[in-house]
Amino acid sequence: GMLATAKHFPGHGDTETDSHKTLPSISFSKDRINKIELYPFKELIKNNLDGIMTAHLNIPSLDKKNISTLSKKIINDLLIEDLKFNGLVITDALDMKAIVDFSEGEHPDITALNAGNDLLLMPENIDKSFKEIKKAYKKNKISEKRLMTAVKKLLSAKYKSGLKNIKPIQTENIVEDLNQDIDFALLDKLAEESITAVKNSNNNIPFNISSEESIGYISFGDDSNMIFYDYLNMYDRVDHLNKLNNDSLIQKVNSYSKIIIGLHKSDSSPFNDYKFTDEEVQIIEKIKDNNITLVIFAKPYSLMDIEIEGIDSILVAYQNSNVFQKKAAQAIFGAIDVKGVLPVTINKKIPVNTSIEIKKKKS
């Protein structure tokens, strides 16, 4: 079975740095945190949430001294006592820089346990952590009550998730079992439903297939674009212009009636860069009056660097996998409906819930 876990308590969404690399700070007042950051946790706790993962943050309004994961004020007093959460409290990884480089005093794993955490995730050195916790317990630095509370909650979570009846997974044909036609059909549908138009001036999309139209394609980013390009060419001839140097590229664009630009960024890791380069932004700025359709195969936040005035159409495909490249090409030529809804705010011109519906062409 599975246990539903919310993260990262008390709220990691409005930070500018990554706790894998440093210690982020939240400077909001206690009142603001209570009204905004804590709201989703309160609602989930009302519905018997199984677990909560803590955040590695500096939050002076809640605790001037301790990192939030190591803070008794934040974990025990706020989460467990004030919010009445009695589920499993799990630390974020304890080998992250926010803990390794910024924790002070006693061993952080001991401090985390005493703060009210039940499960210590990924200590930097497990053997050392075990020995330090055992030593602290013998010296009464960790109480019997705190240790037993954590153990009982862990055993309860294991029982609830069915680990008492665990059976070895049969690995024969496991790849085939996990990759069935019904799964690919669902992925195809999810990709199709998610393609989002955030701009479509003069009903530029869907493209009309015509011998009078000439279409050029420019690919930006560090990842493959071939599926997108191949699918575009299934509908009409599309020339790939990237072999030209930038000056020649800008000149060549003028000979086409439509230009498609694709930002293809690798999504192999959530920490990969998703932004346009400065050079790519400059190219877009110079050619954006040439009937441009911009397709984002990356996080929609990449649009924050782009001035959208002058660009005719913008599609957000969210990731650069083959199925999303295929669906984006189909959307451009009207083979599918476009009805996705933007889940985040980019700026005032592209707010959350932006959704321009584009009907597919009638066959």
Which residue ranges define each predicted feature?
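Second-shell residues forming the walls of enzyme active-site clefts
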Residues: 1-146, 153
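Preference for extracellular/luminal or secreted protein segments
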Residues: 81, 103-363
